[in-house]
């Protein structure tokens, strides 16, 4: 038991390090640009910051959605312990993504966000995804699970439309080459399709068990 706990702690430490590595690298490169005007973030540093943080938010969201299929395929229930932290990191990167847009792109004129939401569909769906993520992040604790009871599970089913909105945000943002958003759309389709298939299979199994056997002729 102690060995398992130690392994989980070590694995969580690695996950934390891996999840924080992209933002640490981005922060270091931003510092270089700020201090020396280097091209560490390319010709358009603001666009690069927004792109990377948004991309990692989407990646971590998809990894979070992959936890349940991974548990079902491997039978390793321990992977569920990583779902909450991965989901919180997805929200963290999404928040940094939004903050970068507000502070670096809009340059602090935050009231323009409402005009942008109405004018640009990709911002509309992206902002909607972030708003839906917020209650999931807030209620991710054990205390909220106890308070909400069955409603907690219903609330956290919002992760599915959030995934769709996030992919759609990326798809609409890209103007020409849609190969990358198409890849993430395909991954999301597989993850959601797996859940639909498992649910239908469970219903069929339940129906077969509840169907009485045919009467034998006397």
Curated annotation (Swiss-Prot):
<keyword id="KW-0285">Flavoprotein</keyword>
<dbReference type="GO" id="GO:0010181">
    <property type="term" value="F:FMN binding"/>
</dbReference>
<keyword id="KW-0288">FMN</keyword>
<feature type="transmembrane region" description="Helical">
    <location>
        <begin position="86"/>
        <end position="106"/>
    </location>
</feature>
<dbReference type="GO" id="GO:0020037">
    <property type="term" value="F:heme binding"/>
</dbReference>
<keyword id="KW-0408">Iron</keyword>
<keyword id="KW-1003">Cell membrane</keyword>
<dbReference type="Pfam" id="PF01794">
    <property type="entry name" value="Ferric_reduct"/>
</dbReference>
<protein>
    <recommendedName>
        <fullName>Protein-methionine-sulfoxide reductase heme-binding subunit MsrQ</fullName>
    </recommendedName>
</protein>
<feature type="transmembrane region" description="Helical">
    <location>
        <begin position="14"/>
        <end position="34"/>
    </location>
</feature>
<dbReference type="GO" id="GO:0046872">
    <property type="term" value="F:metal ion binding"/>
</dbReference>
<comment type="subunit">
    <text>Heterodimer of a catalytic subunit (MsrP) and a heme-binding subunit (MsrQ).</text>
</comment>
<keyword id="KW-0472">Membrane</keyword>
<keyword id="KW-0249">Electron transport</keyword>
<dbReference type="GO" id="GO:0009055">
    <property type="term" value="F:electron transfer activity"/>
</dbReference>
<keyword id="KW-0997">Cell inner membrane</keyword>
<keyword id="KW-1133">Transmembrane helix</keyword>
<feature type="transmembrane region" description="Helical">
    <location>
        <begin position="121"/>
        <end position="141"/>
    </location>
</feature>
<dbReference type="GO" id="GO:0005886">
    <property type="term" value="C:plasma membrane"/>
</dbReference>
<dbReference type="GO" id="GO:0016679">
    <property type="term" value="F:oxidoreductase activity, acting on diphenols and related substances as donors"/>
</dbReference>
<feature type="transmembrane region" description="Helical">
    <location>
        <begin position="60"/>
        <end position="80"/>
    </location>
</feature>
<keyword id="KW-0813">Transport</keyword>
<comment type="similarity">
    <text>Belongs to the MsrQ family.</text>
</comment>
<dbReference type="InterPro" id="IPR022837">
    <property type="entry name" value="MsrQ-like"/>
</dbReference>
<comment type="function">
    <text>Part of the MsrPQ system that repairs oxidized periplasmic proteins containing methionine sulfoxide residues (Met-O), using respiratory chain electrons. Thus protects these proteins from oxidative-stress damage caused by reactive species of oxygen and chlorine generated by the host defense mechanisms. MsrPQ is essential for the maintenance of envelope integrity under bleach stress, rescuing a wide series of structurally unrelated periplasmic proteins from methionine oxidation.</text>
</comment>
<feature type="transmembrane region" description="Helical">
    <location>
        <begin position="155"/>
        <end position="175"/>
    </location>
</feature>
<keyword id="KW-0349">Heme</keyword>
<dbReference type="InterPro" id="IPR013130">
    <property type="entry name" value="Fe3_Rdtase_TM_dom"/>
</dbReference>
<keyword id="KW-0812">Transmembrane</keyword>
<dbReference type="GO" id="GO:0030091">
    <property type="term" value="P:protein repair"/>
</dbReference>
<keyword id="KW-0479">Metal-binding</keyword>
């Amino acid at each position: 038991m102690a060995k398992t706990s130690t392994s989980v702690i070590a694995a969580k430490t690695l996950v934390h390090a891996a999840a924080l590595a992209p933002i640490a690298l981005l922060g270091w490169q931003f510092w270089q640009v700020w201090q020396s005007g280097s091209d560490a973030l390319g010709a358009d540093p603001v666009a690069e910051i927004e792109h990377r943080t948004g991309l990692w938010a989407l990646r971590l969201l998809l990894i979070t959605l992959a936890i349940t299929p991974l548990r079902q395929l491997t039978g390793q229930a321990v992977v569920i312990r990583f779902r909450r932290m991965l989901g919180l990191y997805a929200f963290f990167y999404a928040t940094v993504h939004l903050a970068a847009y507000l502070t670096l792109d809009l340059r602090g004129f935050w009231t323009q966000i409402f005009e942008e939401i109405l004018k640009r569909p990709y911002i509309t769906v992206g902002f909607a995804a972030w708003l839906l993520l917020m209650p999931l992040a807030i209620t991710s604790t054990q205390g909220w699970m106890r308070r909400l009871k069955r409603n907690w599970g219903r609330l956290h089913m919002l992760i599915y439309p959030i995934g769709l909105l996030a992919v759609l945000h990326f798809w609409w943002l890209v103007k020409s080459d849609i190969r990358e958003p198409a890849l993430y759309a395909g991954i999301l389709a597989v993850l959601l399709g797996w859940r639909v298939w498992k649910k239908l299979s469970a219903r069929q199994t339940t129906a077969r068990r509840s169907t009485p056997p045919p009467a034998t002729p006397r």
